[in-house]
């Protein structure tokens, strides 16, 4: 597997992760409305971490 293939696979994985995070956040918000702000913060942190990984991949 070359670098291009790896990046493509990781990119597709990140898209799936974003989708899963959004779905998880929606489920959590419906289950415990009092935790909505906390869940949104977790969701945002996860997205920021994934974005940081994507940026590092582009730099290298």
UniProtKB/Swiss-Prot annotation:
Stabilizes the phosphorylated form of DegU, leading to enhanced production of levansucrase, alkaline protease, and neutral protease. Keywords: Transcription, Transcription regulation. This is Regulatory protein DegR. Induction: Expression is sigma D-dependent. Negatively regulated by ComK. Homotetramer. The gene is degR.
């Amino acid at each position: 597997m070359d670098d291009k293939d790896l990046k493509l696979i990781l990119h597709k994985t990140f898209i799936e992760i974003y989708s899963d995070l959004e779905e998880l956040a929606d489920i959590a918000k419906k289950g415990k409305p009092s935790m909505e702000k906390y869940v949104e913060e977790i969701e945002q942190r996860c997205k920021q971490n994934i974005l940081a990984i994507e940026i590092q991949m582009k730099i290298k």
